[in-house]
A protein has these predicted regions:
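Bacterial N-terminal signal peptides that target proteins for export
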Residues: 1-10
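N-terminal amphipathic/basic membrane-interacting segments and domains
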Residues: 24-373
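Short, linear, compositionally biased motifs with a strong N-terminal bias
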Residues: 14-15
Length: 373
């Protein structure tokens, strides 16, 4: 009877040892507690970088060459001088993930454990993950703001005179020794042609779409002649992109103000490094405090000496972040650009106590996406 009991206890003990080994397929350690002789890899937690894609309109105004004679056409509110000014059309707010080198850990794992990481060393998945795509990659960390990218339209050559530019566009009929009075007569002739087209006085038979096209062409020519008096306004679209890596505020409930770029209607967009006296466009980061309870729990765990000693010796399953939801807003005059973003570094660092057989992380935020038994 005793032999049977001993064998039963031995089998039970072996089962416990076996299950313990299975449960220890992988473990994570802080760098100061990492075992030097163990097989493993270093991984970093994900942090969030905010991306601001800015669309700016560059408005170039040209004074008409006959602006002083605009009274001949009864025009008002004409452009009285050449000039350039800028206005912000749109700001798109988005995010991307980068590796947080200040929060790096060591992961030990056995040969049967499959570990997938991004190019920059952020964990994507652990365990036997089937068809797990690794297309989403953390972008390598870099300091500072990206230099603004502008479209090719920023460098536009301007013709020497207003009239020459319109002639080159084919919008004016060449008239020798053009004067304001001659331009007015040209407008009158073109309007008479439009009347002839509408009344059917033009020789020949034309389809409706041909008549419409001819009328619109004359309209465009009339507008060009009128522009010689009223002036012309050319609008170009310039595109910029800025990135900011915000740091978690000491008091989460307080809004964080982050400079993005400098802007003025006279000079347009400049980077923050620009030394000129220009207003700074600022983003307001308002935390929704969604990780408040997690922060309290982690604070309690950090004060548990027995738990901390156990973690130091045996490690944990894996460290990861619970991202915080943050309202990112930019106010520019009467325009408000806003979006709610998951910012990883504003959230809470935590860990799994054990080693689940399968675990998948969100490549953009580092949050737990799936956890198996």
């Amino acid at each position: 009877m005793r032999k049977i009991i001993r064998k039963t206890l031995l089998i039970f003990a072996l089962m416990l040892i076996s299950s313990g080994v299975m449960a220890q397929k992988y473990k994570s350690f802080t760098l100061d507690k990492a075992p030097f002789d163990a097989k493993g890899l270093y991984y970093s937690l994900v942090q969030t970088e905010l991306v601001f894609d800015v669309k700016v309109e560059k408005i170039t105004e040209y004074k008409g060459c006959y602006a002083d004679y605009s009274y001949l056409l009864g025009l008002k509110n004409i452009i009285i001088s050449d000039g350039v000014y800028y206005r912000i059309k749109d700001i798109k707010i988005s995010s991307r993930s980068i590796a947080d080198s200040e929060n790096t850990y060591f992961l030990t794992y056995d040969e049967k454990t499959d570990v997938k990481v991004s190019e920059s060393g952020c964990l994507l998945s652990i365990g036997d993950v089937v068809n797990q795509k690794c297309d989403d990659k953390c972008v390598r960390s870099h300091k500072g703001h990206k230099a603004p990218k502008t479209s090719d339209t920023e460098n536009v050559s301007v013709k020497s005179t207003f009239e020459q530019r319109l002639l080159a566009q084919g919008m004016l009929e060449s008239v020798p020794d053009m004067t304001a009075e001659k331009a007015v007569k040209q407008i009158e002739k073109l309007r008479e042609r439009q009347i002839d087209i509408l009344s059917g006085s033009v020789d020949g038979t034309y389809m409706n779409n041909t008549v419409e096209y001819m009328y619109k062409q004359l309209d465009a020519m009339i507008d060009s002649y009128v522009a010689m008096f009223a002036g012309e306004r050319v609008v170009e679209e310039l595109n910029y992109s800025f990135t900011v890596r915000p740091e978690k505020p000491l008091i989460v409930e307080q809004d964080l103000l982050v400079g993005i770029f400098k802007f003025s209607a006279q000079e347009g967009v400049k980077p923050l490094s620009y030394t000129g006296d220009m207003p700074t466009i600022v983003a307001n980061l308002h935390s929704l405090n969604t990780t408040k309870e997690y922060a309290k729990l982690e604070s309690q765990k950090s004060k548990d000496e027995k738990l901390q000693n156990k973690i130091a010796k045996k490690g944990v399953g894996v460290y990861y972040r619970i991202p915080e939801k943050v309202q990112v807003s930019i106010v520019n005059g009467e325009s408000i650009f806003s979006k709610t973003i998951d910012i990883s570094q504003f959230g809470q660092i935590t860990y799994t106590a054990d080693s689940p057989s399968r675990i998948v992380f969100d490549s953009k935020t580092g949050a737990l996406k799936y956890i198996g038994k």
